[in-house]
Amino acid sequence: MKITWLGTAAIRLEADGETVLFDPFVQLVGGENPNCLDDFLQDQTICVTHGHLDHLMEVPEFLDPESDAEATVYCGEVAAETLSDMVENTSNVVKVRPGDVIRLGDVRILVMEGKHAKPGKSQVFQKLFSRKFLQYFRNALALAYLNPKFPEGGQTLMYEVHAEGKRVQVMGSLGLQEDQEYPQGADLLILPFQGSEFLEAVALEVVERLQPKRILLDHFDDAFPPVSEHVDTRRFKKLMDEEYPQIK
């Protein structure tokens, strides 16, 4: 099994002869991990966790009949509705909901209910009145225009991949439903480390509930300035070593 982080929440998982791409996104001007659409277009199976632009905006390119991509896209109903407003042919868009199982050869992907993180008001104000906001003002205008077109709509999914005798949990945002029971002990949890004013505390709550064997952090990079920012992960690593030394 091979897992590659491609910036933001984009993850490519290769196992049992299958390749699955989660949440592809091309970073904006000034992004910390510059990439391009060609980095993704060879992928044939796309899983989307939710409808926000940094998870869904590039997906129409995979559905363009004039491109070389002929991908199948799995996503929730809200994200599917967004795609239907953007492309003429959505025959390759498969709506999924919690409890569904996606089967790709010997790979099995369980769809689970997630929850989107809630940024604090102080975080928003800090970004609006920062020098960075002026530096990337064109990005800010583009994001202000695009953001309403990509609603999350209260629907964030989480995926658990079963392949090669391993379980990998892929979260698209740092949140779990309070009344939901989740499988524990995954071989790897891909944890988006962004989006909360109390980031370490919220992440530790997720770890406590899921009890993974290993963790891979993503989404902590500055992908769409001035709205995003680079998040220092060292404090979280220190807390993990203290509270969960068995988790690597």
Stretch-by-stretch model annotation:
Residues 70-73, 84-101, 183, 204, ...:
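Binuclear metal-ion centers of metallo-dependent hydrolases, dominated by the metallo-beta-lactamase
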Residues 21-25, 43-52, 74-77, 169-173, ...:
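Active-site neighborhood of phospho(di)ester-bond hydrolases with catalytic His/Asp-centered motifs
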Residues 77-157, 163-164, 238-245:
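Metallo-beta-lactamase
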Residues 1, 14-20, 101-110, 162-168:
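Beta-strand-turn-beta hairpins that frame and shape the catalytic cleft
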Residues 12-53, 57-65, 69-71, 118-147, ...:
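Pre-active-site segment of Zn-dependent metallo-hydrolases
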Residues 144-208:
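Active-site-proximal loop/helix segments of hydrolase catalytic cores
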Residues 29, 52-57, 80-83, 100-102, ...:
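Active-site environment of divalent metal-dependent phosphoester hydrolases
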Residues 3, 49, 53, 74-75, ...:
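Catalytic phosphate/metal-binding cores of nucleic-acid and nucleotide-processing enzymes, i.e., regions
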